[in-house]
Amino acid sequence: MERDPQAHWLETETALHYARAAVRVGIWASERSLLERHFTKDQRILELGCGGGRVALGLLQSGYSDVVATDFSPIMVSLARAVLADHDEAWEKCVEQQDATTLTYPEASFDRAIFAFNGLMCLPTKAHRLAALRSIHRVLKPGGVFLFTASDREKGANAAYWAKEEPDDEIPGDRWHESDTSPVFIHSSTEAETRGELSETGFTVIECPLSSEIAADGPLVRQFAGETRFYVARKS
């Protein structure tokens, strides 16, 4: 039976896992470093795939005052609202249900956008990733910056895995793997591949370091996320 790439994100147990991470893990040191380098606290920020509210909570607690956190999953939206409201009731209104591939905001609505922890790579096909990139590009202001991460299949443990494994659907980098709840789909890209998709959708890469090249993330972050590659791209 064909597996549904969205099913994992619609489950209560998955949402609870990410809600706990919002409180226990928080913003990574590597994320914070890039946020401080490329974002300012007075900018309007769009978060895609907010999950349980980890990044949104960290941004709001750090003084970023205009944050819109979104997720396509109703249960994720519900729990993210609860997590934020537990800290400040006014923050509950910062969370909205949106599909990253078909954002409904007006053109040039945001100064910055972030799609944390490989969320873009959990979209099921290249066509979906390109649709999301075009949608994000549309709602960013001219010169706006998009920050996201992508699992790199040429580095670290990913490289060792892909040296001996075949892709699950004959597309290099596509993989279903077990989680604490249900199987989850993720695409592990190469740097050249992701740079190409960004160029195709109107973005220029500013930098794309591995998380370990930015900062020493703590043990909770390493357990939660492992190694990943950050991309910082500007709307051309």
Give, region by region, the residue ranges found by the protein language model.
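Conserved class I S-adenosyl-L-methionine
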Residues: 1-40, 43-51, 58
